[in-house]
Amino acid sequence: MGIRSLTRIEAERRSALVTVERYDVDIDLTALPNGPEIRCVSTVTFTCSEPGAETFVDCAAEVRSATLNGTALTPGDDGRIPLPGLAARNVLRVESLQADTTTSPGAHKAVDPADGEVYLWTSFEPDEARFVWACFDQPDLKAPHAFTVTAPAAWTVLSNSGDPRVEEQGAARRWSFPDTPPLSVYNTVVNAGPFHEIRREAGGHDLGVFARRSLAEVLERDADEIFTLTGQGLAFFAEAFAMPFPQRKYDQVFMPEFGGAMENYGCVTWSDMFLRRATPTHAERELLAVVLLHEMAHMWFGNIVTMRWWDDLWLNEAFAEFACHWAAEGATRYTDVWAGHLAGGKLRAYLSDQGPVSHPIHQPIHDVAQAASIFDSITYPKGASVLQQLMTYVGEDRFRTGMAAYFARHAWGTTTLQDLIDALAEAGDRDLATWRKAWLETAGTDRFTLEHDGSTVILVADGTPRPQVLAVGAYDRTGDALERAALVRVEVSEPRTPVTGLPATSDLLLINDDDLTFATTRPDPAGRDTLFRVAARLPTAISRGVAVATVWDMLTAGEATAAEAGRCLTAVLAAETSDAVIEPFLTLVTNIAELWAPDADRPALTEAVAGVCLQLADDPGRRQVALRGLARTATAEGLARLRDQADDDVDLRWRALVREAELGGDVTAESAALLERDPDPDAWVRALTVRAAVPDPAAKAETWQRLAVDRTVPVQSVGAVAAAFWRPGQDALLAPYAERYLAEIPRLDQGGMIPAMVYTSQLFPPYAIDSAYVERAQQAVQEAAPVVRNTLLERSDTVRRMLRARAVNA
């Protein structure tokens, strides 16, 4: 029958019937060093509001035995165990076995190639706990959880509540954790392995960071910064939400073969790729800060107060994404973080919101499978931008007051959208009903331009705009720079809005200056070429970012060429002063050269990017970022210079080898030698990335087998290997793999939500295809799992836009 996805109707019925008193979960990990198995005994104590009724518990692991109030149960073949004849108070006991900890969702066994040590992580969002132990796997059935874990004696076991009682049992130890506060099942966690551990005190909290032993040196390097950011974040959110984090212990665990990061209460799990093997760049450090604060914000948005159902996923993710930037700007050294957000996530969101899978931030969700498909750029960066706009709309002080009231009112419970809107409306003294409908329940992006009506400037919307506040900046040329002569904020609710207070004449008028709202913009027709020409002369990272966002949106909409956009971006890079945006802008312009430019224009644009990299490399603070960019764009002659600059930098040498391999150089011996001396336990992935770039049939076949078929590449490295595999100018070699991608579609959802998203998007071919292929792919995915379908539709729409741009002459 297959594993069924929980529907909203089923969840509402079960929630009305069942109140969970507690979970007692006994987990046995002792088989993992030599095998794949996890054994669990889940005891669920719950009450029933209608004695005699029936329901079901979720368990997609192998059920060894199940009893309800002492009576044996028969599991179904759909990932559920029927629970007939419920009593007023019930005790359910289920013994289960998870025999696949390699590809199954929920729990994963990773073996460190450096020393053979084994590590185990769990990750349960949105409904993957059921693959490990029996539970009511829906967010509104919150309850205390008590975990007892038996593990090899050399291992440390970590869970939500910290401070376990540890008992020696010969070759094993038994870890008994105190009860958690009431949590949704998906917020719980067990991580285990022979960790390297570092602890600090900060603000009354006991902070811990953990990593596999082979990364101990890297963890020690980054520990001070991680602890500093953690202390800053806990203090900021405690004040902003008028509620300190209520648990003394706060752990962060960096795990191998983990995708992204997960906000488990009191015990955040990270991909250990965030522990950069090379010295981190500014953008990489800023990303670490943003992700750290994002997961921390979830302690309040998601853990302490939880969405009732997945249609309010944005209550978790959009708020966490907004709050992490808010906190980073207000409490850490990353004060240009909103500029980084604009240069990265917000640009992706603009593109996604104008594509085939655009959806309202808040929308009806039929079942959890559909919910897995909206962990996307609409929910995250668009949602964060909309909330930034809301704070501007109601005022930051009133926004804080509303947040404090929301948490005081709903702590340890579940909420809906209306609960939050009510709290903010009361605090802000604004009717937010219209705002809610326009921003949260309506898909799409507003677009603004300007008209001059005699002496008046009119802000013109493409249709009826959402209620919002935005700004128009007026700039005049002073020497080689532009200086802001005026900034006028306007509250918009009509298609045409007069903008008063601007100078009679200006060299440039910039719509959405200060980036206060989520909207695309267009210069007036007379100012189009001026914007492209003078964007680099704007005085701040945000103003330059707003100009770049306009140029990018025009490229993706077919209103600007790749050559125009590339010239504008390289000029901005040459003048940029903010480290927060140099790396994302460099990535963006390199992608334009590789993926958007016609074949005839690509060499010149690539050479221009390489030239700005060489210019940036003269600044010692930007040398590393610039040389990484050069490694993507250098010609054979440029690679020689890069080698001289790289010295003993192993990371740069790997990057140079990838480029040299793509250009046809014989790098086999050098790659093998570098692999021998690279201390990174995952260096074999770097060697495979070099192999992936080689324009040779055997190299492509080997890479595809390991990447797409065997899936031996850690999920967090799939993107890098796939990018080296799909290279411009290799169409004849790559064409067969475009067809093989289509054949892989039925199994792209294997392993859970994160692998499904990664494999679907990163393996989609950007080369060796045409628009007819895009249509075939979109048809082929219609019956796939929702997360695969939506990810493919979004990625294929972007590639379709690339194909259109490549067909346009400069």
Where are these regions (language model features)?
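Charged, low-complexity, helix-prone segments enriched in Lys/Glu/Asp/Gln
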Residues: R14-I27, P144-H145, A223, A327, ...
